[in-house]
């Protein structure tokens, strides 16, 4: 079959216009190849302008590209490898390995990155809790199987370690796989994550794909779709429960806004693209549970200037089922994971879904921590002695609850020297209930720090007492 060849007519940064023969225009989202400086530059069709010209977005640098160069329509969208061959490997937006190891493409299945979301009939509509084995997450902001979770936190509060522990737990306890999409990531962070995963041993259950900060907006826009396509294969063809990490979802929106004006669109609020909600919806609607398996997505959310009303985070919030907020104030107390139990939320923390006992225990934990927070000013000024007996008991139990929300992680074992633990939701509820009921008022609060179950705390207390 003869190749469909066009000619480059205009280059504006990452946006390239190509003229094709009449009646031979490539379809929207098709990949078009241009030979440039000894390698193939891939551009993706974004618009058909009339006069047989298509406007495309480049997936790599357009340095050195000239008018009248030949451009070949591939006839399909950008394709990435899927399946077992991707595990333990790192790819770019075009599905090319970037970890420096050989990659045999002979029997590898390739899938296009643009796909339709599952139909309503295929989706599983019954909300179901996804057990992570992390006490504070399961109790306070339980994740929905096939849901979307927003992970909020500044630098150095433990986002990466929490992500690694989730990858480890889904691999060891659920036999599941993970896909990590680095969207507009710092190259250094991606590099650190890769080597940390190799050290902690979870790399073989994970596929990684990166569109780094230094890459053109086209690559950063599409890398989330590349990662999602890899995850969809594990869900649909292998019936797996998959964890999909997107770090950072804001960069996906940011990349879209960078090319929006060059594509000739009028900017909307705060200079964002007018198609913001559509682009976000196209990505998020593909992340769901089906009758075959599920994709549960954890998305790191950067909030520009801490303004939650900014259109980018505000559009993301509309899709989230749960939010996990990491707090620097909690890391300063030495409590890890540093999840803020008063700021984190979940749509399924509802007695109809998680059960009455779970719901009541979670709410009581939040109530006692809130009361402790209110009393802290009094304690700071007047000291503990000025509190009523009831408030003294509240403070004592709240401090134990606060410490019991911490837990040793498997992936941090080489730093802490403490073996990590996976705690079932039943054990989690039982432990917090016993503390709230006052069954462990006689134990020192240090016994509750970095332990798994309540039985572990009792054993630790005996060791402390000698």
From Swiss-Prot:
It is found in: Cell membrane. It holds the Pfam family ATP-synt_VA_C. Keywords: ATP synthesis, ATP-binding, Cell membrane, CF(1), Ion transport, Membrane, Nucleotide-binding, Sodium, Sodium transport, Translocase, Transport. Its EC number is 7.2.2.1. It is a peripheral membrane protein. ATP binds at residues 153-160. SMART domains: AAA (SM00382). It catalyses: 4 Na(+)(in) + ATP + H2O = 4 Na(+)(out) + ADP + phosphate + H(+). Inhibited by nitrate. InterPro entries: AAA+_ATPase, ATP-synt_VA_C, ATP_synth_F1_bsu, ATPase_a/bsu_AS, ATPase_alpha/beta_chains, ATPase_F1/V1/A1_a/bsu_N, ATPase_F1/V1/A1_a/bsu_N_sf, ATPase_F1/V1/A1_a/bsu_nucl-bd. This is ATP synthase subunit beta, sodium ion specific. It comes from Acetobacterium woodii (strain ATCC 29683 / DSM 1030 / JCM 2381 / KCTC 1655 / WB1). The gene is atpD.
């Amino acid at each position: 079959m003869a190749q469909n060849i066009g000619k480059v007519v205009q280059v504006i940064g990452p946006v390239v216009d190509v003229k094709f023969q009449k009646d031979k225009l490539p379809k929207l989202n098709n990949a078009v190849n241009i030979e440039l400086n000894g390698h193939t530059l891939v551009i993706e069709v974004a618009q058909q302008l009339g006069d047989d010209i298509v406007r495309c977005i480049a997936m790599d640098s357009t340095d050195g590209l000239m008018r009248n160069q030949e451009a070949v329509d591939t006839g399909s969208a950008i394709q990435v490898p899927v399946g077992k061959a991707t595990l333990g490997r790192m790819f770019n937006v075009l599905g090319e390995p970037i970890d420096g190891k050989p990659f045999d493409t002979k029997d590898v299945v390739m899938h296009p990155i643009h796909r339709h979301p599952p139909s309503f009939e295929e989706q599983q509509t019954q909300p179901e809790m996804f057990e992570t084995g992390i006490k504070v997450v399961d109790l306070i902001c339980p994740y929905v199987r096939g849901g979307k979770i927003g992970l909020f936190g500044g630098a150095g509060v433990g986002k990466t370690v929490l992500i690694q522990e989730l990858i480890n737990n889904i691999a060891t306890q659920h036999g599941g796989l993970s896909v990590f999409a680095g969207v507009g990531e710092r190259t250094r962070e991606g590099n650190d994550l890769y080597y940390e995963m190799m050290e902690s041993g979870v790399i073989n259950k994970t596929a990684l794909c990166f569109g780094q900060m230094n890459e053109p907006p086209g690559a950063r826009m599409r890398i989330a779709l590349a990662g999602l396509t890899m995850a969809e294969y594990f869900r649909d063809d292998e019936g797996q429960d998959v964890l999909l990490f997107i770090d950072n979802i804001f960069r996906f929106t940011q990349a879209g806004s960078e090319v929006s004006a060059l594509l000739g669109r009028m900017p909307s609020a705060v200079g964002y693209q007018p198609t913001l909600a559509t682009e976000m919806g196209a990505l998020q609607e593909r992340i769901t549970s089906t009758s075959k398996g599920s994709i549960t997505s954890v998305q790191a959310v950067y909030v520009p200037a801490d303004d939650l009303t900014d259109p980018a985070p505000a559009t993301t919030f509309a899709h989230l089922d749960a939010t996990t907020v990491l707090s620097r104030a909690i890391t300063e107390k030495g409590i890890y994971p540093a999840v803020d139990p008063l700021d984190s939320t979940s749509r399924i923390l509802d007695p109809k879904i998680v059960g009455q006992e779970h719901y009541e225990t979670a709410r009581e934990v939040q109530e006692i921590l809130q009361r402790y927070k209110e009393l802290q000013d009094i304690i700071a000024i007047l000291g503990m002695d000025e509190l009523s007996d009831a408030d003294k008991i509240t403070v004592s139990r709240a401090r134990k609850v606060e410490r019991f929300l911490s837990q040793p992680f498997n992936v941090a074992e080489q730093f802490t020297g403490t073996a990590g633990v996976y705690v079932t939701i039943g054990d989690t509820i039982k432990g917090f209930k016993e503390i709230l009921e006052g069954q462990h008022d006689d134990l020192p609060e240090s016994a509750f720090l970095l332990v798994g179950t309540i039985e572990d705390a009792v054993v630790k207390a005996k060791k402390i007492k000698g």
